Amino acid sequence: MKPRKNHQSISNDDFLIIRLIPNIFTTVGMCIGLTGIRFALESDWKSAVVCVLIAAFFDLVDGLTARMLKATSKIGAELDSLSDAVSFGVTPTVILYLWIVSITQAHNTYMLGWYWIPFIFYSSCCVLRLARFNTTNREASKQDEPKVVSYFVGVPSPAGAILLLTPIILEVNMLRFGHSTTGMIQPFYVCLWVMAVSVLMVSRIPTISLKSIKYKISYRKVIFVLISVILSAAVIIREQWLSLSLAIFIYIISIPIFALYVKRIK
């Protein structure tokens, strides 16, 4: 009987470790997101943006891993929300604000105080959006009504963070092709952009979710799809920032199109 007990205890330990994997991914993503602030303090804007992108990747992976391993838990859901608040609510705010200060070389504390207000608004909207997401998820789990199509209500926080950092991404692309950005980027317009992204996050506009993308591929099209994926990967590797800008543009265009699609099928 004793060997069986030992075997059972080992199995339980292994099971507990497996259940911790999604939470480990969440914590690592948060740490990487916070590292973006460090790079911003060093004026390394590319690395700062990359940290937010990696944090968004880990945010996607931890959810998928939790569902695959059947390791979803209440503490995991709360940890995920707190991590998102840090990685996508605080980090991009600090990065973009420090970037504005650097490009304007503004030392007027009065104007800098005004510039800071939209960023506070963004962080607040991000937290409110996460709170609403948690609440609606709990309510949806109690109901068995099937959805016609899966979607997010408002722009999700990872997408909102990437949208927020679009001015930096555009500057990187302009410098990549030898264009000067001196005097082109005005803090006022950046602040308007921050406000627009903030409103989109807390809006009731349905936005596209990966779960809503369901496309059956026939056997004949497999080769074509694989070739397309390989070519796309090659382009992304060659022009990462240009590809990122294109992806952001496509996502922005998809917002009104997908909203009209959801309205039509309801």
What are these model-derived regions, one by one?
Residues 35-50, 93-119, 167-189, 237-241:
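Helix-coil boundary and interhelical linker segments in multi-pass alpha-helical membrane proteins
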Residues 21-35, 87-94, 158-159, 163:
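The first (N-terminal) embedded transmembrane alpha-helix
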